């Protein structure tokens, strides 16, 4: 991933200090991508927006933090509809998912959706959530814990 970010086509997005792109600022998803990227920068990441080629399932971002590079597919949660469907549809795009929660989504349902995602996708590594100024990272190990629902809801609902 480091080599991808060093590709000469990445330039700073106009008006930003830690968000890079290879173009596509006028893509229909750009505002949602930029919103999530701003939150990632607030949490200490440098963000690289990846191109979105037609007919090809790819991740949306590479985050760099303290020398580590991670690739994420963005799913923005606008309403109270099923996050589970969005998570399952992301299988094959990236092994890390970023859920940008912009609505009041039930913590119990969200925990169940995340657990089901890890069960359905053996390659899944992490589901990262942004909810307001809060960030919650859930890995496979945590989702398999018998205490997962209680621990997740405590973090999510506080």
Positions of predicted regions on the chain:
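Short acidic/glycine-enriched loop/turn segments that link adjacent beta-strands
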Residues: 54-57
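Conserved catalytic cores of phosphodiester-cleaving nucleases, focusing on short active-site segments
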Residues: 61-63, 68-76
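Metal-dependent nuclease catalytic core centered on acidic motifs
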Residues: 1-48, 77-158
